[in-house]
Structures are given as structure tokens and as C-alpha cells.
């Protein structure tokens, strides 16, 4: 039976780990769970897109879901959020955010690379509409619209 590697998070760390696991083990099943809409994007390039140093949106993406799956033989599950991990049973509970369905996957190996959440310090006016965080492509689109309106 094939060994199953489950990787939580599909941006820089998770995508790199999936590619490395594939190089080390050509026969295992590798599943990447990413709750967002994109895999393997250049998150350090996001401010450059807003500031128009990077003009083409597609240049932010190292791989698409399809190209990553084809190149590394990895099952990429975008818009799938890991809800819980049972280390004893070696199972993870996952929610497909598009279908609004919850399912369970067994795994032999589990790697966690879920990313981060922006920190907003408790200071006056932190919730002002002109203050924003930047962590992912969704934030980038929103902030780019604001930038174009305000030309800040």
C-alpha cells in the first residue's frame, strides 16, 4: 500500500516540502491542503504588484494547481481547510470549502506549513479603513483596488 504524505499549507513552505518529498519518494501519495485559492505564489512579491513594479498578476505565481500536480504528481486540494488532526489515529479532518463538506483522510506522514496571520497591534485607529494587512493574493487584490483609488 502507498504511503500517504499529508501537507497542510500550499504556499512557500508546503509547496517546497511537497516537491522535496516527491524527489525523495516517487511512489508515495502526496496531498497538499490549502484553504486559499492559490498554491506556490511569491508572497514577498505582493507589495511589488500593488506598487506596480510587478505589472502582470500571473508573474506572482510560481506554479498553478494544474502545473504543480502535473510536474510533481501531487494531489493539490485548494479551498480545503484542515479542521483537526488526530495524531493517534493518523487522520486529519478536512472541510471542502466549495462543497461545504467535511471528510477524513488517513496519513502516514504529516507536515504542517499553515502560514501565518497578520498581527494588528492594539493602537488607536488600527481599524481605520486606510490601514490594511497584506498576507495573500486576496489581500493583494483588495489593497490594489484601494491603492488605485487613493494613489497612496
Question: Whereabouts are the PLM-identified features?
Answer:
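FAD-binding core/adjacent interface of flavoenzyme oxidoreductases
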Residues: 2-6, 66-152
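Beta1-alpha1 glycine-rich phosphate/pyrophosphate-binding loop at the start
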Residues: 2-75
Amino acid at each position: 500500500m502507498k504511503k500517504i504524505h499529508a501537507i497542510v499549507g500550499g504556499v512557500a513552505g508546503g509547496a517546497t516540502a511537497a516537491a522535496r518529498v516527491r524527489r525523495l519518494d516517487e511512489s508515495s501519495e502526496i496531498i497538499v491542503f490549502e484553504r486559499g485559492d492559490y498554491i506556490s505564489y511569491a508572497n514577498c512579491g505582493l507589495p511589488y504588484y500593488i506598487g506596480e513594479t510587478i505589472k502582470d498578476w500571473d508573474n506572482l505565481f510560481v506554479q498553478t494547481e494544474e502545473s504543480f500536480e502535473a510536474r510533481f504528481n501531487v494531489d493539490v486540494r485548494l479551498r480545503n481547510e484542515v479542521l483537526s488532526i488526530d495524531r493517534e489515529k493518523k487522520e486529519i479532518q478536512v472541510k471542502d470549502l466549495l462543497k461545504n463538506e467535511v471528510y477524513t483522510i488517513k496519513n502516514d506522514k504529516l507536515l504542517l506549513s499553515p502560514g501565518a496571520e497578520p498581527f494588528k497591534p492594539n493602537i488607536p485607529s488600527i481599524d481605520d479603513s486606510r490601514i490594511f494587512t497584506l498576507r495573500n493574493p486576496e489581500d493583494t487584490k483588495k489593497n490594489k483596488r484601494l491603492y488605485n483609488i487613493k494613489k497612496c
